[in-house]
């Protein structure tokens, strides 16, 4: 009976140790998950720009890059960006090409799902698009063209796709 108690005590202590090891950085892990690639990082920085500028997106690449360069280096590091290499953020990891970004997109305090970051080349005829609601979706050229022209936001495009 004593041996069983000792084994249960060991299992209990190990369980507490493991829970402590994995729960300590949950906020950091969540933040990292929301910024797992350059599309998501750019979308989140675009949204942050909007928050600080009356929900208007940056007017051009120069304004966006200036905003990122002036952003807190500590906050950039927390989302996986080397503050000394912010230009690398504008290159897609999947295809190695620069992103296309829709500048001047109006956001909303209530949230919106407008597309703002686009793969320029993509893979196998499909291109990833990053939306202001922090989602990303791989689309074909026709949907890409519609979203790039601002013809639909992410929700409208998804409804249209589901209804066809």
What are the residue ranges of the model-derived segments?
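Positively charged n-region of N-terminal signal peptides that target proteins for export
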Residues: 1-7
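Generic detector of short, well-ordered, non-transmembrane alpha-helical segments enriched
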Residues: 17-19, 60, 130
């Amino acid at each position: 009976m004593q041996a069983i108690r000792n084994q249960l005590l060991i299992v209990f202590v190990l369980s507490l140790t493991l829970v402590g090891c994995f729960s300590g950085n949950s906020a950091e892990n969540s933040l990292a998950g929301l910024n797992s690639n350059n599309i998501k990082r750019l979308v989140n920085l675009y949204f942050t720009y909007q928050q600080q500028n009356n929900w208007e997106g940056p007017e051009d690449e120069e304004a966006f890059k200036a905003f990122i360069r002036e952003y807190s280096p500590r906050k950039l590091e927390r989302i996986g960006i080397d503050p000394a290499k912010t230009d690398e953020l504008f290159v897609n990891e999947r295809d190695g090409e620069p992103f296309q970004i829709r500048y001047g997109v109006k956001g909303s305090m209530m949230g919106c799902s407008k597309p703002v970051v686009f793969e320029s080349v993509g893979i196998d005829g499909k291109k990833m698009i990053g939306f202001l609601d922090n989602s990303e979706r791989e689309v074909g050229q026709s949907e890409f063209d519609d979203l790039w022209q601002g013809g639909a936001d992410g929700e409208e495009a998804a409804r249209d796709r589901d209804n066809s």
